Amino acid sequence: MEEVGLKRILQKLFQHKEIKPLCCVAIEAGPDRKREYGVAGKADYQGLGNRANFYSSFVLQELLPFLYKTYNNLTFTQISIAGFSLGGLSALDIAWKHPGVFEIAGIFSGSLWWRSVDMLDKTYSDDKHRIMHQQIRKGNFQPGLKFFFQCGNMDETEDRNNNGIIDSIDDTLDLIMELEAKGYDKNKDICYYEMPAGRHDMQTWGKAFPVFLKWAFGDKLKG
């Protein structure tokens, strides 16, 4: 997280009393992340994400218990999970499936295009084959769960439906619509942050991260 500038971001926000005290843990993205990240139990059409269930189990059964044990003198009132790109897809999937553990999901340039059928296949349909959208559609409203989505207008150049909007933004806005259809309030439960010059890189996510932290953990001490 050095490229994102996490330490500097946290120090500045704490100094200005813009966020509550928090414990922030970063998981290293390993060389097998294309298999470890994704939607647990549902690999994409290439077989990627086929180890997402193991990654989810690591977070829930190893990492969180370790943190509770290590910081047993602290009381955690709110737990969030966030990620960039494929990590954002994983964060959303894990939070969605474990709402009793996580209250907030942060998705930065999320790989919400994750699909069960190749888009070049003539049978492909956005409505049927985007995996995370289907997970939301088939799931249930979970009270208390909140979502932060960030996209950049320069995340990519692909526009598979030729509507003049890049796919990453289309996929994100469509997923937000799925959440709204479940009963989530777009003003109270969802934050969508679109960056005009945002790219698919650490520098962009570093600029977006303070926005997420203030939205998720904003403090009332200032002023």
Where are these regions (language model features)?
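Non-catalytic cap/lid and distal C-terminal segments of serine-dependent acyl enzymes
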Residues: M1-G223
